[in-house]
Amino acid sequence: MDNSDAILAMMDAFDNGGQGLAVWDPKDNLTSFNINYKKIFSSNMHFSPEVGLNFGKAYADAAKNPKFTLDPENTKQRIAQREQARLDKRPIESEYEVEPGKWLHVKETASNDGHMITVLTDVTARKTREIMQSKLADAIDAIPSHVMFWDEKEKLIKANKLAVKENLEYEVELREGMSYAEFLSSQF
């Protein structure tokens, strides 16, 4: 397998994994990308990427389009982080809500020669779950009586703030993962 076959295999593997993959040269010009990257980029930037496209210019051009929804401050920060990542040779990771209800995880890693590898992963399902779990936790905490949830193995999953606070008054510390037997024995 020669080098170009290896690159194609890598691009295909990332496509099969549902991730976008792009390679940028040391001057931040796009050298290669997979199909998923093209789809994600086109959806967010409102134009298709092409080999030779400059990263900063792409954002400047996209910002002129009224459909472009990414925050200009986030864009400046991302460009600065990419430059710092090139200097530090450390990956940077961020999550962005690219449109209402759609989230991307972006990981960018610099090579030793200054190239930047960008991996885009759609994390909308996970972010939606996290948001719903947070709302549920807030709702449970708002209930004006003790609420404790136990799993099938009688381990504490969640206790609302009132239950935690009032049990502490009796020196009973509620901890996620504690058994129901521990809870009962700590009361007496």
Q: Whereabouts are the PLM-identified features?
A:
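Short coil/turn motifs at helix boundaries and re-entrant loops, enriched in small/polar
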Residues: 1, 13, 18, 101, ...
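Sensory coupling linkers of modular signal transduction proteins
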Residues: 1-4, 111-137
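Sensory modules in modular signal-transduction proteins
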Residues: 3-30, 132-152
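Sparse, context-dependent recognition of short Cys/His-centered cofactor- or disulfide-binding micro-motifs
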Residues: 6-8, 15, 79-83, 88-91, ...
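A generic fold-level signal
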Residues: 16, 111-112, 142, 175
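PAS-family sensory domains
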Residues: 19-87, 145-188
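Generic "edge-of-domain/loop-turn" microfeature
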Residues: 28, 103, 113, 125, ...
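PAS-family sensory/regulatory modules and their coupling/dimerization elements
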Residues: 64-121, 188
